[in-house]
């Protein structure tokens, strides 16, 4: 009798994806973040579902409903903080996952990489809309400022903004539709994740050396299931430490008062994971230019396969490229810091220099470094 795991149509898919999947024997813990992102998504969907049962998407009661969840609903406080800090864990894993892809040349698998970039945009859109829902001052003014950026689009901009707002300002209509989209997008993300995995399993995983590993593969289970479980345990532990000891560490205290359209906070800033993009946006004095730079700061990832000039796939044996990569990481950390600072000297000029360096590194310095390394190979 054939093994049901290998013959049943449904179990066969699971078996080929998670159990008998051939995986390179040399992949390090940097390859854990895909499964961690899957766990983050599951946590977000589950906690979000239970929060949605008690949340009301009306401007008069939204803030009160969040307070009610934290005070009156059984374990509502832990649901709310798991969801808020789960988003932070999601982005930490996302940034590390993308960074791993850049370092080890995973972008050579174009389809997987491009679906990944679309996923990044979708997660960022979801997180932005979720931040609007508690209806505190940062929620309200963040929604106003970011949606208002679309008015920079020539000809259709103003109409587009009013269409998104559902009126002439951020109001009831905006909150209701943001809640609807915030609920819908995670399921679209789940579908995209399956497409991402579909393309990945067409080629198989990359490995730290960047050399094809077809001759040295091991089954995913038990080796990498155990490894992923260890990573999951570490991440869940970190998340619970954050939620139970300092749940407001990454949030903004300004958001603990109800939104007031008549009173603008002194410093409008997004959650920490958007600060690097916000700094790039602010560093350009022109509205349309800022919006373009903001979009391109993420969209530039799609160009990575075209900008790959090296004869080697991974950066493992390319010390000069490693220097450029870590310079890029340092630059992104600088941008994150600048995004949270007020718009005044010296932060303005630091932000502008860091923004220029960001684009310069990806578009010019890293490809040139790779070409130099190709010539050094001949010595």
UniProtKB/Swiss-Prot annotation:
Pfam families documented for this protein: Cytochrom_B_C (PF00032), Cytochrome_B (PF00033)
**Protein residues bound to a ubiquinone:** 201
> Which Gene Ontology biological process is one annotated for this entry?
mitochondrial electron transport, ubiquinol to cytochrome c
Q: Which UniProt keywords apply?
A: Electron transport, Heme, Iron, Membrane, Metal-binding, Mitochondrion, Mitochondrion inner membrane, Respiratory chain, Transmembrane, Transmembrane helix, Transport, Ubiquinone
Q: What does the record give under GO molecular function?
A: metal ion binding; ubiquinol-cytochrome-c reductase activity
Q: Which InterPro entries does the UniProt entry name for this protein?
A: Cyt_b/b6_C, Cyt_b/b6_C_sf, Cyt_b/b6_N, Cytb/b6-like_sf, Cytochrome_b, Cytochrome_b_C_euk/bac, Cytochrome_b_N_euk/bac, Di-haem_cyt_TM
Cite the binding residues for heme b b566: 97, 196
Q: Does the keyword Chloroplast apply?
A: no
- Main subcellular location: mitochondrion
For this chain's record, the cofactor binding note is:
Binds 2 heme b groups non-covalently.
SUPFAM superfamilies tied to this protein: a domain/subunit of cytochrome bc1 complex (Ubiquinol-cytochrome c reductase) (SSF81648), Transmembrane di-heme cytochromes (SSF81342)
- Taxonomically, the superkingdom here is Eukaryota
Keyword Iron tagged: yes
Protein localization? Mitochondrion inner membrane
Say what the protein does.
Component of the ubiquinol-cytochrome c reductase complex (complex III or cytochrome b-c1 complex) that is part of the mitochondrial respiratory chain. The b-c1 complex mediates electron transfer from ubiquinol to cytochrome c. Contributes to the generation of a proton gradient across the mitochondrial membrane that is then used for ATP synthesis.
Which family does the UniProt entry place this protein in?
Answer: Belongs to the cytochrome b family.
Assembly and interaction partners = The cytochrome bc1 complex contains 11 subunits: 3 respiratory subunits (MT-CYB, CYC1 and UQCRFS1), 2 core proteins (UQCRC1 and UQCRC2) and 6 low-molecular weight proteins (UQCRH/QCR6, UQCRB/QCR7, UQCRQ/QCR8, UQCR10/QCR9, UQCR11/QCR10 and a cleavage product of UQCRFS1). This cytochrome bc1 complex then forms a dimer.
Instruction: Tell me the protein's name.
Output: Cytochrome b
List the gene name.
MT-CYB
